[in-house]
Amino acid sequence: MKNHSFIFFCYNGFMKKIIITATAESIEQVEELLEADVDRIYVGEKNYGLRLPHNFSLDELTRISDLVHQAGKELTVAVNALMHQEMMDKIKPYLDFLQEIEADYITVGDAGVFYVLQRDGYKLKTIYDASTMVTSSRQINFWAKNAGVSEAVLAREIPSAELFKMPEILEIPAEVLVYGASVIHHSKRPLLQNYYNFTHIDDEKTRERDLFLAEPSDPQSHYSIFEDNHGTHIFANNDLDLMTKLIELVNHGFCHWKLEGLYTPGHNFVEIAKIFVEARDLIEAGKFSSDQAFVLDEAIHKLHPKNRFLDTGFYDYDPDMVK
């Protein structure tokens, strides 16, 4: 493989630098990720945050906010749940709390939350996160214009051929998942519990139970599934790893990378974060090469959980295959 170097370029000047957001499963891991030099920490609590490695208490979120800001970094808190009316009735005290601890961003996907934020004059910056539904530049621009959204989380099912067209129209920065488990379906219904009831099975439904679905025609397929107070969550067959695609992403304006640790617990996730930080620094210095990308990618594969597999997801798909 030829050792080509690349020049750092961020399309349309959306971001002055590459931003790495990482999830966290504990206060100790927050400290380790800050030491690793990630830019943002992504956390939340049980009632309003979806698919988090850990549900923190309000006291823990306060402590995390202090740690993040003392390190000169930013805090994003998940408020991206699909809301029922009773959740909306109780959301104001939580938004008050997030403003009090000075959360830098909150992720929001429900129109009702945007309404409350605007109606009551909250100063919280928002990131539009409607999961698998965020596939259109114009959709994102709508929320930027009408709800004051600062950034957006892109769906993971967008092929690169379609992805690279988006910055020409996008008016705000967009986050791309570059590592970790990728959700492909969320239902508010208790699908696992319904299955257990039908089959008379008594079993756990949690993420830690490590349940998965397999296609009848492909017994090797592995779609992770778990159920919690927000319903049922199903994930892609393989986890995502875009280390070898980072230069392409940056050169097309995608300078906000997300690292998802939902199925990569403990120290290994921190080590993987360090690898992406190294890639970020090399790219920004104009010293990143295809050989380095290959070496770093191999290191990620060694740290990734042995019972899970990595690929580039929909990145190289023909757009006609996913319409």
Where are these regions (language model features)?
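Intrinsic-disorder-associated, low-complexity terminal segments enriched in Asp/Asn/His/Tyr and depleted
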Residues: N3-H4
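Active-site pocket-lining/capping segments in soluble small-molecule metabolic enzymes
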Residues: N12, K16-T132, V153, S160-K323
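Conserved nucleotide-cofactor-binding alpha/beta core module
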Residues: S137-R138
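Acidic-histidine catalytic/liganding microenvironments
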Residues: N146
